[in-house]
Amino acid sequence: MDHIRNFSIIAHIDHGKSTLADRIIQRCGGLSDREMEAQVLDSMDIEKERGITIKAQTAALSYKARDGQVYNLNLIDTPGHVDFSYEVSRSLSACEGALLVVDASQGVEAQTVANCYTAIELGVEVVPVLNKIDLPQADPANAIQEIEDVIGIDAQDATPCSAKTGQGVEDVIEALIAKVPPPKGDAAAPLQALIIDSWFDNYVGVVMLVRVVNGTLRPKDKVLLMATGAQHLVEQVGVFSPKSIQRDELTAGQVGFVIAGIKELKAAKVGDTITTMTRRAEAPLPGFKEVKPQVFAGLYPVESNQYEALRESLEKLRLNDASLQFEPEVSQALGFGFRCGFLGLLHMEIVQERLEREFDMDLITTAPTVVYQVQQRDGTVLTVENPAKMPDPSKIEAILEPIVTVNLYMPQDYVGSVMTLCTQKRGAQINMSYHGKQVQLTYEIPMAEIVMDFFDRLKSVSRGYASMDYEFKEYRQSDVVKVDILINSDKVDALSVIVHRSNSQYRGREVAAKMREIIPRQMYDVAIQAAIGSNIIARENVKALRKNVLAKCYGGDISRKKKLLEKQKAGKKRMKQVGTVEIPQEAFLAILQVDDK
């Protein structure tokens, strides 16, 4: 056990985490040069394209160190994005050490800090590494200073390297072996194994990635999953070097995979503990929690006959993504579709992109909403994740909305514009600190404001330099109202939004004006109204197309002309009673693009 090192790599997006992992795998001979490819641990196309890691992957490597000993290194690749923070914390709790990779030319950024604090809280040894030192604009001294200022760990002996050229990678591995403690655990104790991640394989069912903390896991063992209480028979165990290699057993301190003929991913929850039926562990490993979706949106197929196909696609995605939730939903405007719950905005984008890409779906997405808690007059509490389900205003005692703590990092030139943005978004400043040229701002902002377009606007006001991460803090009472859009006094449920009262007038006017541009002119007048309950707060009219009925009258009596006009008017009125307005596809997208002032 003294020769095992379990570690993961923490970094902000684009600081070179996956490239460094590639180099370490190559140096340890995990893959031959022919099999080596860029970002070898990122298996989905979308991961490679966006350069982000979504699922955790592992590689078990053996390395002959300079002291002549052979060490087993288990690299656990973690997602770096804030939406997947629970998966990150599970991956980190399976390690004893973490390489903190910081881009020497850019310094510390938000997600580095968020994940690094998670690591320190879990008692993981953090080993700082400066990457990209081959760049002409690299400034290692400044980066070291920032690591010490912002994160507060000693970085004087941070290892410089360049993952691209491979320079210094050996030093990184040596530093890792020297600083990271070997795993503690008892191979003879009852089995406790932590599920770090799980995914679905078409041939063998669910593959679970586990870290064995105590005990030994062998094929033919009957195991119990402690959170769900399900029992399974282990079929095979093994390790990834990134290729899968079967082993006879996994013992304490090792990281590997387990296949137990599980049919669906819901049964193998990330963070759950596996133990054997014959010798049960006293208690599960700490830290397990159910992942709850934070952001909801409606997904509808453009063609209504694609509904079944959309359901199948969502079910296939759920095989590989247990945090995705969905339930059928009917909208008068959009027909049949699904209400889906996501961990955050990035997660939502990825699901949409995978549906469009891997399953060829054409989708309409409604505006994302967060989960509100509604206290009713009769004392019951509802959770509302869909504006259409919001009860009548007369029944509502109070509405609570989720508040998140947002940490923002940016160069000091952009502080003013970022603070203005946060204030517009109803943010309350909690803290502000300077670290060299970088500034850290902490705000509490309602989550609803974040999901709208906060991230895009943050990037634009800071020219792409600001980075952020957020975490849920609490529910707070808030004066929010539901704004309905009526077209010819029919409610269009898919266009309803929940906004703060101070912003509702503006929002209603904007949406109505936007609709007026988008809805094509009909043979009769179309009235577009925005309403809160029964109060109309904004109205726009789309004028009717009309024929010039007076063209055939030359001169003649005014009463003749009046008669023709009245007749036309009566005809239009009749049409208006029976006509329905087709709402074009763009209208639903336009809702997402209404800019806040």
UniProtKB/Swiss-Prot annotation:
Reaction catalysis annotation:
GTP + H2O = GDP + phosphate + H(+)
Query: What CDD domains does the record point to?
Result: EF4_II, EF4_III, LepA, lepA_C
InterPro entries from the UniProt entry: EF-4, EFG_III/V, EFG_V-like, EFTu-like_2, G_TR_CS, LepA_C_sf, LepA_CTD, LepA_IV
Top EC class for this record? hydrolase
**Localization terms from the record:** Cell inner membrane
**Keyword terms of this UniProt record:** Cell inner membrane, Cell membrane, GTP-binding, Hydrolase, Membrane, Nucleotide-binding, Protein biosynthesis
Q: Which residues bind GTP?
A: 14-19, 131-134
Its EC number is: 3.6.5.n1
Return the Pfam families for the record: EFG_C, GTP_EFTU, GTP_EFTU_D2, LepA_C
A molecular function GO annotation: GTP binding
Explain the purpose of this protein: Required for accurate and efficient protein synthesis under certain stress conditions. May act as a fidelity factor of the translation reaction, by catalyzing a one-codon backward translocation of tRNAs on improperly translocated ribosomes. Back-translocation proceeds from a post-translocation (POST) complex to a pre-translocation (PRE) complex, thus giving elongation factor G a second chance to translocate the tRNAs correctly. Binds to ribosomes in a GTP-dependent manner.
The entry's family comment says: Belongs to the TRAFAC class translation factor GTPase superfamily. Classic translation factor GTPase family. LepA subfamily.
What's the protein called, per UniProt?
Elongation factor 4
The species this protein belongs to is: Cupriavidus metallidurans (strain ATCC 43123 / DSM 2839 / NBRC 102507 / CH34)
Q: Which gene produces this protein?
A: lepA
